[in-house]
Regions:
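N-terminal secretory signal peptides that target proteins for export/translocation
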Residues: 1-12
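Metal-dependent de-N-acetylase/amidase catalytic core
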Residues: 2-3, 20-21, 28, 32-42, ...
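General helical structural elements
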Residues: 6-8, 19, 95
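Bacterial N-terminal signal peptides
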Residues: 11-27
Length: 223
């Protein structure tokens, strides 16, 4: 089976046919093929980004590009026996180990698992993350997931997508000069419409690295 990451443009610009990884870089405005690209991916929980974009992250990191994963919650609720700060501390350490294994940054924010809402406060956190990373590419879930934390992660990134260039909002962090390219992770949801990829990136050559990332999340996959 050919392993791949699929992505869908989050804006309403011209659609692209399915292309390989190098072509993804070519759609970035004002970017030469040999320039370093800065990618940031958002998930609701520690391990969400790994599942959605671990292969792409490993591939781009190996090519010298800069990649960061951000979990909007600290994962302090999703376990059979542990919970609270003890679990959050463990999940944060697992995420950082996952990032270390492929050479990317991994940040876990301190919002509570299962209680994420699309508030102005969290939207501003997302705007700061995108600006501080000086992102060229932003990846997030579509805002139609069954899980409210996943769904609201999509809403928050979608709401932040325009605001990252507005100078009079979140004034403690300089705005970007131009909008990044915003992409969605692939999914199997059919409402309001099925996912249709614009970009497909083969991850056959880095699939073992993606598995290694997931293996770091012991509390998520082995307990």
């Amino acid at each position: 089976m050919r392993r791949r990451l699929c992505a869908h443009f989050a804006d309403h610009g011209p659609r692209l046919a399915c292309v390989l990884a190098a072509a993804l870089l070519s759609v970035l405005p004002g970017r030469a093929q040999d320039q370093t690209v800065r990618v940031i991916a958002f998930g609701a929980h520690p391990d969400d980004c790994d599942l959605g974009a671990g292969g792409l992250a490993a591939k781009y990191a190996a090519q010298g590009h800069k990649v960061k994963f951000v979990s909007l919650t600290n994962g302090d609720a999703g376990h059979q026996s542990q919970h609270g700060e003890e679990l959050a501390k463990r999940r944060r350490a697992e995420a950082q180990e996952a990032g270390r294994r492929i050479g990317i940054e991994y940040e876990v924010l301190d919002n509570h698992d299962g209680k994420l809402l699309p508030t102005l406060e969290v939207r501003e956190q997302v705007i700061r993350e995108i600006r501080q990373w000086k992102a060229d590419i932003v990846i997030a879930p579509r805002p139609n997931d069954y899980h409210p934390d996943h769904r609201y992660t999509g809403v928050l990134v979608q709401d932040a997508s325009y605001m990252v260039i507005v100078p009079n909002l979140v004034t403690d962090t300089p705005p970007l000069k131009r909008n990044p390219v915003f992409l969605y992770y692939s999914d199997r949801f059919t409402r309001p419409q099925p996912f249709r990829p614009d970009i497909i990136v083969s991850i056959d050559d880095v699939f073992d690295k993606k598995v290694s990332m997931l293996d770091a999340h012991v509390s998520q996959f082995y307990e």
